[in-house]
Every structure is written in structure tokens, then in C-alpha cells.
């Protein structure tokens, strides 16, 4: 839930107007909107490279995944792995745009561990791929923007622990 929605829900629950502090937080959120959109645009524009390089780094670190019997062995399974990495990058951009983890949580992380366990896919490999993408994505951004994006990658990774 965004800071705007949270503030309104809280104020309404108490049958009051928004406080000066709440209005200041909403103002800061609105003013940071263009920056968040720029970060999401950079990640979106570079998504193919981020996913491809992230996958390559993952497969170099975790050769068991692409070896015979591994979950990403063969072209089709490798493509499936890269598709999943792309999905998590997309979720991160949703969080950045919203300025909140709710889209990440509600759209993509509910039951993630259970799903991968049921498929026999090591969640540690998926998490390593997301970590690789985080490093690549954050290298494309300035310090403050990198920290902003890093927060949403870290949130995603936390759900995989």
C-alpha cells in the first residue's frame, strides 16, 4: 500500500483530516515520483542485458543448474530460467514505480518458495540469479538510485530465504 493510501486509510479510520506530517510524507513521495520512474525506465530499457548477463553469471557460479540433470539443463529449461529472472526484474520495477513493496508481495512472492520446492527447483539458484541481476542493474544507476533499486531487489531476495 502506497504512502498515500496508507495515510488516507489511517486518517479515515480516525475520522480526521490528514496531518501536516502525513501531508509532508505524501509531498515527498510525489516529488520523488519522477526519480522512481527514471529508475524503472533505465531497468526496463536494459532488461534484456540485465537478464542475459544475470543468467550467464548464475550459470557460471552454479554449473550444477546447467549440467545434465540440472533445472536449467538444455535450451528449453535455460529459457525457462531466464524467463523467471525476467519476471523478478519486472516485479522490482513495479515496486520502484509504486514506491512500495506491495506490488512485489501481492503479484509475485506469495508462495514462491513452495512453488519452486514443488517443481524441484532449488530456490537458492533463483535467489542467486536475482542477486546477479541486482549487481548488474545497480551498476547502471547512480548511488542514490542504486540504493533505491537495491532495496526492492533485497526485498525480493528476502522472500526467497
Swiss-Prot record:
It holds the Pfam family Phycobilisome. The modification N4-methylasparagine is found at residue 71. One of its GO terms (biological process) is photosynthesis. Contains one covalently linked phycocyanobilin chromophore. GO terms for cellular component: chloroplast thylakoid membrane; phycobilisome. Light-harvesting photosynthetic bile pigment-protein from the phycobiliprotein complex. Allophycocyanin has a maximum absorption at approximately 650 nanometers. PANTHER family: ALLOPHYCOCYANIN ALPHA CHAIN (PTHR34011:SF2), PHYCOBILISOME 32.1 KDA LINKER POLYPEPTIDE, PHYCOCYANIN-ASSOCIATED, ROD 2-RELATED (PTHR34011). Belongs to the phycobiliprotein family. This is Allophycocyanin alpha chain. It comes from Aglaothamnion neglectum (Red alga). The gene is apcA.
